[in-house]
Amino acid sequence: MGLTGLGKIVSQIIRQIAHGLEYVGDKVSHYIRLALHYLYEFAKAFYHYLGKLYDTFQRDPIRFLQFAGSLAIMTYYGVL
């Protein structure tokens, strides 16, 4: 026995809702993957920056500490 007129309408509404939920889920997962990708790239860049910072500290620790201290003071007073 086939669907009645009302059954066809309800079936179509349910199908459209399911399609809309699938679309929203795809968009959410896309943006989550995009955010994770940029977070990963930021972590890689930060790791590279810390490596260079450590190398600078190894070469000339006194000058580096003077720079870090002045940077901390400027940050504290809101200049930076």
UniProtKB/Swiss-Prot annotation:
The protein's name in its UniProt record: Uncharacterized protein ORF90
Species of origin: Acidianus filamentous virus 2 (isolate Italy/Pozzuoli)
